[in-house]
Curated annotation (Swiss-Prot):
Entry keyword annotation includes Repeat: yes
Pfam families (alphabetical): MraZ
Localization per record: Cytoplasm, Nucleoid
CC terms in the record's Gene Ontology section: cytoplasm; nucleoid
UniProt keywords, alphabetically: Cytoplasm, DNA-binding, Repeat, Transcription, Transcription regulation
Main subcellular localisation: cytoplasm
Record CDD domains: MraZ_C (cd16321), MraZ_N (cd16320)
GO function term, MF aspect, one: DNA-binding transcription factor activity
Domain annotation SpoVT-AbrB: ranges: 7-69, 98-141
Gene Ontology BP annotations: negative regulation of DNA-templated transcription initiation
The name this protein goes by in its record: Transcriptional regulator MraZ
Family: Belongs to the MraZ family.
Quaternary structure annotation from Swiss-Prot or TrEMBL: Forms oligomers.
Protein backbone atom coordinates (compact mmCIF):
# COMPACT_ATOMS: atom_id res chain seq x y z
CA UNK A 1 0.00 0.00 0.00
CA UNK A 2 1.32 3.42 -0.95
CA UNK A 3 -0.39 5.05 2.02
CA UNK A 4 -3.25 7.47 2.44
CA UNK A 5 -2.41 11.01 1.28
CA UNK A 6 -4.56 14.09 0.81
CA UNK A 7 -7.42 15.97 2.42
CA UNK A 8 -11.12 16.08 1.58
CA UNK A 9 -14.14 17.86 3.00
CA UNK A 10 -17.16 15.58 3.44
CA UNK A 11 -20.53 15.52 5.17
CA UNK A 12 -22.34 12.78 7.04
CA UNK A 13 -25.42 11.39 5.34
CA UNK A 14 -28.85 11.50 6.99
CA UNK A 15 -28.10 8.26 8.89
CA UNK A 16 -24.81 9.51 10.33
CA UNK A 17 -22.65 7.52 7.92
CA UNK A 18 -19.41 8.73 6.43
CA UNK A 19 -18.59 8.04 2.79
CA UNK A 20 -14.88 7.18 2.65
CA UNK A 21 -13.33 9.21 -0.21
CA UNK A 22 -12.83 7.11 -3.33
CA UNK A 23 -9.10 7.77 -3.46
CA UNK A 24 -8.70 6.27 0.03
CA UNK A 25 -11.21 3.49 -0.58
CA UNK A 26 -9.36 2.24 -3.66
CA UNK A 27 -6.47 1.08 -1.49
CA UNK A 28 -8.45 -1.14 0.85
CA UNK A 29 -11.44 -2.15 -1.27
CA UNK A 30 -9.03 -3.93 -3.62
CA UNK A 31 -7.97 -5.92 -0.58
CA UNK A 32 -4.60 -4.33 0.07
CA UNK A 33 -3.61 -5.34 3.56
CA UNK A 34 -6.86 -7.18 4.16
CA UNK A 35 -6.48 -10.92 4.57
CA UNK A 36 -9.27 -13.48 4.38
CA UNK A 37 -9.86 -13.60 8.14
CA UNK A 38 -10.24 -9.80 8.13
CA UNK A 39 -13.45 -9.98 6.11
CA UNK A 40 -16.82 -9.88 7.81
CA UNK A 41 -20.37 -9.73 6.61
CA UNK A 42 -21.13 -6.38 5.02
CA UNK A 43 -24.01 -4.32 6.36
CA UNK A 44 -26.06 -5.44 3.35
CA UNK A 45 -25.64 -9.10 4.40
CA UNK A 46 -23.00 -9.90 1.80
CA UNK A 47 -20.00 -11.88 2.90
CA UNK A 48 -17.36 -9.51 1.58
CA UNK A 49 -17.54 -6.55 3.95
CA UNK A 50 -14.26 -4.89 4.83
CA UNK A 51 -13.80 -3.51 8.30
CA UNK A 52 -11.67 -0.78 9.80
CA UNK A 53 -10.67 0.13 13.34
CA UNK A 54 -12.03 3.48 14.51
CA UNK A 55 -10.33 5.20 17.44
CA UNK A 56 -11.01 8.37 19.43
CA UNK A 57 -7.67 10.19 19.40
CA UNK A 58 -6.51 12.26 22.40
CA UNK A 59 -6.37 15.43 20.25
CA UNK A 60 -10.13 15.39 19.58
CA UNK A 61 -9.96 13.75 16.16
CA UNK A 62 -10.95 10.25 15.04
CA UNK A 63 -8.53 7.80 13.42
CA UNK A 64 -9.31 4.96 11.02
CA UNK A 65 -6.91 2.03 10.65
CA UNK A 66 -6.89 -0.93 8.30
CA UNK A 67 -6.67 -4.35 9.99
CA UNK A 68 -3.02 -4.95 9.12
CA UNK A 69 -1.94 -1.62 10.61
CA UNK A 70 -4.04 -2.17 13.72
CA UNK A 71 -2.54 -5.65 14.19
CA UNK A 72 0.94 -4.08 14.38
CA UNK A 73 -0.29 -1.59 16.99
CA UNK A 74 -1.94 -4.44 18.88
CA UNK A 75 1.40 -6.30 19.02
CA UNK A 76 2.97 -3.25 20.65
CA UNK A 77 0.14 -3.05 23.17
CA UNK A 78 0.47 -6.77 23.93
CA UNK A 79 4.06 -6.10 24.99
CA UNK A 80 2.89 -3.77 27.75
CA UNK A 81 2.52 -5.18 31.25
CA UNK A 82 -0.84 -5.33 33.00
CA UNK A 83 1.16 -5.16 36.25
CA UNK A 84 2.66 -1.76 35.42
CA UNK A 85 0.02 0.86 36.31
CA UNK A 86 1.04 3.30 33.54
CA UNK A 87 1.11 0.63 30.86
CA UNK A 88 -2.18 -0.83 32.03
CA UNK A 89 -3.77 2.64 31.98
CA UNK A 90 -2.55 3.24 28.43
CA UNK A 91 -4.02 -0.06 27.26
CA UNK A 92 -7.32 0.70 28.98
CA UNK A 93 -7.49 4.18 27.43
CA UNK A 94 -6.75 2.89 23.93
CA UNK A 95 -9.13 -0.06 24.03
CA UNK A 96 -11.89 2.08 25.58
CA UNK A 97 -11.62 4.48 22.65
CA UNK A 98 -11.71 1.79 19.95
CA UNK A 99 -14.47 0.32 17.80
CA UNK A 100 -14.72 -1.78 14.66
CA UNK A 101 -16.74 -0.42 11.73
CA UNK A 102 -17.79 -2.25 8.58
CA UNK A 103 -17.46 -0.56 5.21
CA UNK A 104 -20.63 -1.16 3.20
CA UNK A 105 -20.73 -1.68 -0.58
CA UNK A 106 -21.12 2.07 -1.13
CA UNK A 107 -17.96 2.77 0.87
CA UNK A 108 -19.74 4.15 3.95
CA UNK A 109 -19.05 3.58 7.62
CA UNK A 110 -21.37 4.36 10.55
CA UNK A 111 -20.19 6.88 13.13
CA UNK A 112 -21.93 6.58 16.49
CA UNK A 113 -22.97 9.54 18.63
CA UNK A 114 -20.15 8.73 21.07
CA UNK A 115 -17.53 9.15 18.34
CA UNK A 116 -19.21 12.18 16.75
CA UNK A 117 -19.42 13.89 20.15
CA UNK A 118 -15.76 13.16 20.88
CA UNK A 119 -14.74 14.87 17.62
CA UNK A 120 -17.34 17.65 17.82
CA UNK A 121 -18.74 16.63 14.43
CA UNK A 122 -22.28 17.68 13.59
CA UNK A 123 -22.40 17.26 9.79
CA UNK A 124 -19.28 18.52 8.00
CA UNK A 125 -15.90 16.89 8.49
CA UNK A 126 -12.41 16.78 7.03
CA UNK A 127 -10.69 13.48 6.23
CA UNK A 128 -6.90 13.59 6.08
CA UNK A 129 -4.82 10.78 4.63
CA UNK A 130 -1.93 10.35 7.08
CA UNK A 131 -0.01 7.48 5.47
CA UNK A 132 -1.06 4.45 7.54
CA UNK A 133 -4.33 5.92 8.78
CA UNK A 134 -7.13 8.32 7.95
CA UNK A 135 -7.74 11.14 10.44
CA UNK A 136 -11.21 12.67 10.75
CA UNK A 137 -11.64 16.21 12.08
CA UNK A 138 -14.44 18.69 12.62
CA UNK A 139 -13.34 21.48 10.19
CA UNK A 140 -13.29 24.38 12.67
CA UNK A 141 -11.47 22.31 15.29
CA UNK A 142 -8.81 21.35 12.74
CA UNK A 143 -8.43 24.97 11.60
CA UNK A 144 -8.01 26.05 15.23
CA UNK A 145 -5.39 23.38 15.98
CA UNK A 146 -3.42 24.28 12.84
CA UNK A 147 -3.68 28.03 13.54
CA UNK A 148 -2.68 27.67 17.19
CA UNK A 149 0.36 25.60 16.23
CA UNK A 150 1.41 27.31 12.97
CA UNK A 151 4.59 28.70 14.52
CA UNK A 152 5.66 25.27 15.72
CA UNK A 153 5.78 23.71 12.23
CA UNK A 154 9.31 24.86 11.38
CA UNK A 155 10.68 23.80 14.77
CA UNK A 156 8.98 20.41 14.62
CA UNK A 157 10.07 19.79 11.02
CA UNK A 158 13.63 20.80 11.89
CA UNK A 159 13.68 18.41 14.83
CA UNK A 160 12.33 15.37 12.99
CA UNK A 161 13.60 15.79 9.41
Amino acid sequence: MAGFIGKELHALDEKGRLMIPARFRRDFVRGNGVVAEDKRKGSDGSGDGIYLYLMKAPDGSLELYEPDVWQEMKKSLAGLSDFNPEERLLKTMIYESLDVVTVDRQGRIPLTKEFLDHAGIMKELVIIGADTKMVIWEPERLASVLHDNAGRFTALAGRYF
